[in-house]
UniProtKB/Swiss-Prot annotation:
PROSITE patterns: ATP_GRASP. It comes from Pectobacterium carotovorum subsp. carotovorum (strain PC1). This is Formate-dependent phosphoribosylglycinamide formyltransferase. ATP binds at R114, K155, S160, S161, G162, K163, G164, Q165, E195, G196, L197, V198, E203. PANTHER family: FORMATE-DEPENDENT PHOSPHORIBOSYLGLYCINAMIDE FORMYLTRANSFERASE. It catalyses: N(1)-(5-phospho-beta-D-ribosyl)glycinamide + formate + ATP = N(2)-formyl-N(1)-(5-phospho-beta-D-ribosyl)glycinamide + ADP + phosphate + H(+). GO terms for cellular component: cytosol. GO terms for biological process: 'de novo' IMP biosynthetic process. Mg(2+) binds at E267, E279. Pfam families: ATP-grasp, PurT_C, RS_preATP-grasp-like. Involved in the de novo purine biosynthesis. Catalyzes the transfer of formate to 5-phospho-ribosyl-glycinamide (GAR), producing 5-phospho-ribosyl-N-formylglycinamide (FGAR). Formate is provided by PurU via hydrolysis of 10-formyl-tetrahydrofolate.
Length: 392
């Protein structure tokens, strides 16, 4: 039987968030709703989740010794990674010492690295994927591109939000693509994956929950990407019954192989009735922010409920809904927002993340909308997002 202690008391139940951005902030809010003590950690001060946590710490989470020292000092009941840039080998060590890593340390280690999860999916589980090669030098990169053929995509094996990714259509782009991949890796330069292009009708995120009462699926989420990052997402994405069945089977196999309780964002390509695996994150997914308006339990609530060992039961989807990012471009450490009075249309919501500064283009908020159709919901969400003026 689960016992939840009271925050800031001797028997408090403590959650340590490794990563304190907008997704971590929503996880922190769901923890707070259950009276859980939240410790927010990130590499910069005043990150969104830090603003609502009981305590916060600024460390380099790629420094295993610093991470270990902080965990030993705080003694959290649950260590919840919310980003990829973490010393995952140290998480494996901490788990062996008795600490609870969500969903488990091995899942975090494998999915931080595109090579680990791709080899698990394609070579161990036999899941359909794009053609791929790995390279760790410019020479082997060129050989990989030659083997895959044009056009192809290159990505650092460790990166997020499209950083370091390029579409290569000709040999003239190789130098630029290699250098960009080396700049975009989470842990600096290094190994890359070269992938062949996949013919698909659309991409989905299938939020998959592994909980004490089994595997649960949210309705498929469609999304539009630009510059490697999502701009709008919508739920439900319409797809054939056979494709949805195959997607759920694929997601279930991958999630069970990774292990541990929590919510996983499984990214898939869909072409007719065929489904091809792309990636998986063992945590809430940015495209899943639409669930803050589309479901009775958001992806963040589902994640917390699952890793605490609580049953999910069922997830109720309210109907056509969408999200659109608020993505300004400016330089400021004193950001201000205007226009909400006119931007907030009926059946819409706005989330401003509270990021302390902006240097260039940065996702600072999200607009949420519900409507009769997903197409209408997307257009309304985009209109709401465009109505928010960001200055500094």
């Amino acid at each position: 039987m689960l016992t939840i202690g009271t925050a800031l008391r001797a028997d408090a139940t403590r959650v340590m968030l490794l990563g304190s951005g907008e997704l971590g902030k929503e996880v922190a809010i769901e923890c707070q709703r259950l009276g859980i003590e939240v410790i927010a950690v990130d590499r910069y001060a005043d990150a969104p989740a830090m603003q609502i946590a009981h305590r916060s710490h600024v460390i380099n989470m790629l420094d295993g010794d610093a991470l270990k020292a902080l965990v030993e000092a705080e003694r959290p009941d649950y260590i919840v990674p919310e980003i990829e840039a973490i010393a995952t080998d140290m998480l494996v060590t901490l788990e062996k010492q008795g600490h609870h890593v969500v969903p488990c340390a091995e899942a975090t280690r494998l999915t931080m690295n595109r090579e680990g999860i791709r080899r698990l999916a394609a070579e161990t589980l036999g899941v359909p994927t794009s053609t791929y090669r790995f390279a760790d030098s410019e020479e082997s990169f060129r050989q990989a591109v030659e083997a895959i053929g044009y056009p192809c995509i290159v990505k650092p094996v460790m990166s997020s939000s499209g950083k370091g990714q390029s579409l290569i259509r000709s040999a003239e782009q190789l130098d630029k693509a290699w250098n960009y991949a080396q700049q975009g890796g989470r842990a600096g330069g290094g190994r890359v994956i070269v992938e062949g292009l996949v013919n698909f009708d659309f991409e989905i995120t299938l939020l998959t929950v592994h909980a004490v009462d089994g595997i649960h699926f949210c309705a498929p989420i469609g999304h539009r990407q630009e510059d490697g990052d999502y701009r709008e997402s919508w739920q439900p994405q319409q797809m054939s019954a056979l494709a949805q069945e195959r997607a759920q089977k694929m997601a279930s196999d991958v999630v069970k192989a990774l292990g541990g309780y929590g919510l996983f964002g499984v990214e898939l390509f869909v072409c007719g009735d065929e489904v091809i695996f792309s990636e998986v994150s063992p945590r809430p997914h940015d495209t899943g922010m639409v669930t803050m308006i589309s479901q009775d339990l958001s992806e963040f609530a589902l994640h917390v409920r699952a890793f605490l060992g609580l049953p999910i039961g069922a997830v109720r989807q309210y109907g056509a809904s969408a999200s659109a990012v608020i993505l300004p471009e400016l330089e400021s450490n004193n950001v201000r927002y205007q226009g909400l009075e006119s931007a907030l249309l009926p059946h819409t919501q706005i989330r401003l993340f509270g990021k302390p500064d902006i240097g260039g283009k940065r996702r600072m908020g999200v607009a949420l909308a519900s409507a009769e159709t997903t197409e209408d919901a997307v257009e309304i969400a985009k209109r709401v997002a465009a109505g928010v003026t960001v200055s500094g």
